[in-house]
Design a protein with these regions (language model features):
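Conserved N-terminal entry element of GNAT/NAT acetyltransferase domains
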Residues: 2-5, 51, 55-90
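A conserved beta-turn-beta hairpin within the catalytic core of GNAT-like acetyltransferases
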Residues: 24-25, 154-164, 173, 192-195
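Conserved GNAT acetyl-CoA-binding A-motif
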Residues: 30-31, 182, 189-201
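Conserved beta-strand-loop-alpha-helix junction that forms the acyl-donor binding cleft
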Residues: 39, 199-209, 226-227
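Helix-loop element at the rim of GNAT/NAT acetyltransferase active sites that forms part
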Residues: 97-114
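Conserved acetyl-CoA-binding loop-helix of GNAT-fold acetyltransferases
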Residues: 166-168, 174-191, 210-214
Length: 243
């Protein structure tokens, strides 16, 4: 198991509180008091300690898990101004919408799967001793227009690897948003100790293959007729990059 995923809370009640927040993405103090077998008088103290130790962040009554993920970065390309930043639970609806908009083009099957998972779980970020999942988003104003997603493996022998998906909605392509998202995702993956990052796309998605190759990725393998898009069978192109 990666060192980064070994969590030490120092108290059983703190572990229960962290686990609850991590599973739900965001919660309020009232949720903890109602749903946990923890002395209500101690909850605010334990949250304060978890906040001090860098496990949780508190904004008003909202409690979220903390990732060591950096800050928002602003960019401009021509008339387009955008921000790349860590995703928050409040981005869930906009992020799912952006991923599904890209997936509807029928050329990014893995992205569609990611949208299904977070839509079902209703949780964006995961950080526990079995699973790690991070999103960064690109926003124009308050709208999510792109994302990068990094998810580690649950298997011990694959914990040096992580899957990455990245996408930008059609109207905002060509402004370097995808490149900034990819760079941010790979930086984060490297900081978490991952060594090999992989992605898979249909062979018909020439743009995605060229984009990744232009950023140092290589074709690792091809699985023939792996996807069925309508009446047509399409190969899966498996790509990776080493950090």
């Amino acid at each position: 198991m990666n060192v980064q995923r070994e969590l030490d809370f120092g108290h059983d009640d703190r572990e229960r509180i962290y686990d609850y927040v991590e599973r739900h993405g965001e919660c309020a103090f009232a949720d903890l008091e109602t749903n946990l077998r923890v002395d209500p008088r101690g909850i605010r103290h334990h949250v304060a300690i978890l906040r001090r130790d860098g496990y949780l962040e508190v904004d008003g009554d909202a409690i979220e898990v903390v990732f060591d993920d950096g800050t928002a970065e602003e960019y401009r390309d021509g008339e387009v101004e955008f921000v790349v930043r860590p995703a928050h639970q409040s981005d869930l609806t906009g992020l799912i919408g952006a991923i599904r908009q890209v997936a509807e083009e029928g050329r990014y099957i893995e992205a569609e799967s990611v949208a299904d998972v977070i839509d079902h779980e209703e949780v964006l970020l995961r950080h526990n001793e079995l699973e790690e999942r991070m999103f960064f988003v690109a926003t124009v104003g308050s709208d999510v227009v792109g994302w990068v997603h990094v998810a580690g493996s649950e298997l011990d022998k694959l914990q040096h690897t992580a899957e990455l998906t990245v996408g930008v909605i059609d109207n905002y392509r060509g402004h370097g948003i995808g490149s900034h998202l990819l760079e941010r995702g790979l930086e984060w993956a490297g900081s978490r100790g991952y060594e090999k990052i992989y992605n898979s796309v249909p062979a018909s998605n020439d743009d995605a293959i060229a984009f990744l190759e232009n950023h140092g990725w290589a074709v690792e393998a091809t699985r023939e007729d792996h996807y069925k898009l309508g009446d047509r069978y399409v190969d899966e192109v498996m790509m990776d990059v080493r950090l």
